Amino acid sequence: MNSDQVTLVGQVFESYVSEYHKNDILLILKERDEDAHYPVVVNAMTLFETNMEIGEYFNMFPSEVLTIFDSALRRSALTILQSLSQPEAVSMKQNLHARISGLPVCPELVREHIPKTKDVGHFLSVTGTVIRTSLVKVLEFERDYMCNKCKHVFVIKADFEQYYTFCRPSSCPSLESCDSSKFTCLSGLSSSPTRCRDYQEIKIQEQVQRLSVGSIPRSMKVILEDDLVDSCKSGDDLTIYGIVMQRWKPFQQDVRCEVEIVLKANYIQVNNEQSSGIIMDEEVQKEFEDFWEYYKSDPFAGRNVILASLCPQVFGMYLVKLAVAMVLAGGIQRTDATGTRVRGESHLLLVGDPGTGKSQFLKYAAKITPRSVLTTGIGSTSAGLTVTAVKDSGEWNLEAGALVLADAGLCCIDEFNSLKEHDRTSIHEAMEQQTISVAKAGLVCKLNTRTTILAATNPKGQYDPQESVSVNIALGSPLLSRFDLILVLLDTKNEDWDRIISSFILENKGYPSKSEKLWSMEKMKTYFCLIRNLQPTLSDVGNQVLLRYYQMQRQSDCRNAARTTIRLLESLIRLAEAHARLMFRDTVTLEDAITVVSVMESSMQGGALLGGVNALHTSFPENPGEQYQRQCELILEKLELQSLLSEELRRLERLQNQSVHQSQPRVLEVETTPGSLRNGPGEESNFRTSSQQEINYSTHIFSPGGSPEGSPVLDPPPHLEPNRSTSRKHSAQHKNNRDDSLDWFDFMATHQSEPKNTVVVSPHPKTSGENMASKISNSTSQGKEKSEPGQRSKVDIGLLPSPGETGVPWRADNVESNKKKRLALDSEAAVSADKPDSVLTHHVPRNLQKLCKERAQKLCRNSTRVPAQCTVPSHPQSTPVHSPDRMLDSPKRKRPKSLAQVEEPAIENVKPPGSPVAKLAKFTFKQKSKLIHSFEDHSHVSPGATKIAVHSPKISQRRTRRDAALPVKRPGKLTSTPGNQISSQPQGETKEVSQQPPEKHGPREKVMCAPEKRIIQPELELGNETGCAHLTCEGDKKEEVSGSNKSGKVHACTLARLANFCFTPPSESKSKSPPPERKNRGERGPSSPPTTTAPMRVSKRKSFQLRGSTEKLIVSKESLFTLPELGDEAFDCDWDEEMRKKS
């Protein structure tokens, strides 16, 4: 730079400082220490806006311009000092430094990664984490030398590029042409303090969370001088503004010169207390305030929205997500009167079998936390977790480990049990005292580790519930007692759970979609950063519950002495504060205390009241408010706090009454998910607004019932409104009959997947099994598309599936046909809404199902004819048998209940009865069939073996679904219905039974008395509407079936039930006689039912079947790999007993 440029830059900067930083300079002038170094922080954006020319010079010559800035700053300070009226109170300071910050955000000036060689000489902003700090040194930056010949005295500055070494000139720099090369250092053995400055080197590393997988974080040294020394410590996140420079050792002969890139810092900004680039303005806060205002009447539903957005790729696991969210929210750190610091961070340990999603939670938590470190136990040592002493350039320095780097953040440790024994003890202090004391290589210090530890581990071998957690995972009690929560995830090998998880994974793989209801990762990160600023205080009611629970834990006979100490009470307080933060509150209420006690009871650290829980199969509740009410009743009764219970129940009742009419418009618009559709027959669907219902259907997150939550928005018809009170009455009666079991988390195995058997009583005359069998099969052809199990059909609601919906791929050619179906169904629904009917449903406890099944089988063997009640009307059409939806019921463990529900009559075609019982005993199985592809017309039905539907009054419907969906060790054939449901059905066995009087039979059953064909009975119902099923028969040639549909809308369970049965045509013989009895049941041969046809109105469809080698296969164009929805009862089968029966 020439003199004119230097003058211009100095004048502009001096005027800028005098205008914008006059107050800062006045404060500096009032300081008493004249030798100290004082910074003046200047915003680069404001400076460059004042004069763009300065910005150009600054980018081209940063070192020279910074020196000019310091000189201009001293002149400006002198000018301000002279302008003061009372200069006695101030003094001039010579060590003033201009610190540049706030560079324009562009890739040329702001870097998140370590600079490279091309950046040398540029002024940059670099973000990183401090991993090493050296000792503060004294640096002599200039010396005086005198020429021995001419006695000329000159000053030599230390060369930064050569590690601040002094390089003597080759000749005397005097103007008298002295060519002497001998000089004498005037400084001698001691240096003047004015010629020395503080000097420190730190080492920064790229932030791990900003790196891609497999990238090794790079590091570089940063030079700190003057006032920047000791401005940071190991583990701090920094934004450093400085000049990228290179330096090398002095040259030596025959030694390669090693050049090192360093950053000479001009200004350091510590980001520990900031949100790492997350903007927290009023608009963002207002957005979250509006969110909670929307869920003011049901705050737990709003909380579940957040929980469902936490790690959405993992299905269910409601309890684990709640615990992780509470740990991420964190408690409040306190310092008592004696100076002892009580930690506010909670620690969580996930213990589970392989494949239970532990690592997924750790990875997601590390992503949404600004300061996080993810490591594994097998790859970590005590030094790697705490602090390391390293020797560099002949001196020892301390290098921070994972816990120090995660200070004020999150440290995730996977495979926690892989830590060596002596390494585990090293983190005891870091977990409880939140500090690490080091005495290594003569360096004694204490570093902060105010971090939350989220660890995951596998049990040692098979988890034994009879043993303690310490024995199962081989970790010591002192270490386990430092974890606030220990959740156990046991893989119980539940077939229903396996089916749901596999369907969830496969559906997401095939049809990935982005939800509009779930929160994005950026929104989650912003929310958790925002709530950590809240400081909730404990209320008296919350204190009372936590204190009473702590006392109960201490008095428990099976208590863990190492756990039930004062640490338990502190853990309860921390978790209660964390839940209050999660709920966006500044007070810890009774709701927070009840939730914390319930979570603690479900962990291995609790269990004094109700026992531990397997957290793997916990699911999102259908109604969070009702779940909380059950928690209150159970916990407060156990804690003997009846006054709080009665007061809380009154508060909940008032809140519910206030929100009834306020939420009515919103309730009608909310979509019903499979969780809320689990009602009895004819009962209206519960239109609730829980988070699982409002968001999970958008992203196809499956409910524990196994159905994708993707139903379109459905407005209930007007005739459903009067039945809401009835539903609430039954809900209250059901709640009064509950036992004190820990089922508020709606376990997969009990709450959502244990359907009860029911008995249906119809007021209409009973028809024979054959008539009932022949009148219902035609309804299976009422649409090309079937909904998945537990999900409403697209034909039912008159809407097309979205491209992101799972189970049914997008087909543009279905648009027109579906529109017509929607109009027809809506008009028919309005007509059928006025037809009254009544059905009584009785739910049988699970422990009676086996007994009922045995009695039903015994009665079936003794039966020789159709009961007399099954009379055939003289007219060709009769009322249908109403079949309530078992799979969509909402059963509770060991709680029988009865619901009165309404259905409408329908008219059907019937056929003469037969004698199915004798045929069942004579029937045999057929060989496994082969797969043949055919593109014939939709209504083509290939010839194949026939099946007989036998009248059996007490055959359990649980066996029906089990045998229909699980062809284990049974020859049969596989049939794919238009709903893409693949079901395997053994030939010759009956899976449908007709209605029987409830006074004789406990479980609900249906008998199909069809002697010559295998037919199923669908249910066409929505609310109080029922449909008229139509006759469908199968022949050995193409048949066209049509009929008039009187139904309103098809129930989701109807389609799931249709998928469980096969449509098989009669054999070519067409013999109407019953099949002859075979001596060897191992022989296989088809029976010969007659071929019949019936009219059909709706469009034709294709089917997918596995048949014999001579049979043709008709394949649907739709997805073929969606499994039917089955309840737990479908899997309760003793296959050894079944095989013995067959043999």
Curated annotation (Swiss-Prot):
GO MF terms held by the record: ATP binding; ATP hydrolysis activity; chromatin binding; DNA helicase activity; enzyme binding; MutLbeta complex binding; MutSalpha complex binding; MutSbeta complex binding
The entry's keywords: ATP-binding, Chromosome, DNA damage, DNA repair, DNA-binding, Helicase, Hydrolase, Nucleotide-binding, Nucleus, Phosphoprotein
Reactions that this protein is recorded to catalyse: ATP + H2O = ADP + phosphate + H(+)
Basic residues composition-biased segments: 726-735
Signal sequence range: none
Stretches with biased composition (Polar residues): 687-701, 768-782, 868-881, 974-997
Single GO BP term: female gamete generation
Pfam families found in the cross-reference section: MCM, MCM_lid, MCM_OB
Domain MCM: residue ranges: 300-505
UniProt binding sites for ATP: G352, D353, P354, G355, T356, G357, K358, S359
One GO CC annotation: MCM8-MCM9 complex
EC number annotated for this UniProt entry: 3.6.4.12
Subcellular compartments: Nucleus; Chromosome
Region Disordered: start-end pairs: 656-738, 755-815, 868-916, 942-1011, 1063-1105
Known role: Component of the MCM8-MCM9 complex, a complex involved in the repair of double-stranded DNA breaks (DBSs) and DNA interstrand cross-links (ICLs) by homologous recombination (HR). Required for DNA resection by the MRE11-RAD50-NBN/NBS1 (MRN) complex by recruiting the MRN complex to the repair site and by promoting the complex nuclease activity. Probably by regulating the localization of the MRN complex, indirectly regulates the recruitment of downstream effector RAD51 to DNA damage sites including DBSs and ICLs.
PANTHER family associated with the record: DNA HELICASE MCM9, DNA REPLICATION LICENSING FACTOR MCM FAMILY MEMBER
Name this polypeptide is given: DNA helicase MCM9
Organism: Homo sapiens
Lineage of producing organism: Eukaryota, Metazoa, Chordata, Craniata, Vertebrata
Gene encoding the protein: MCM9
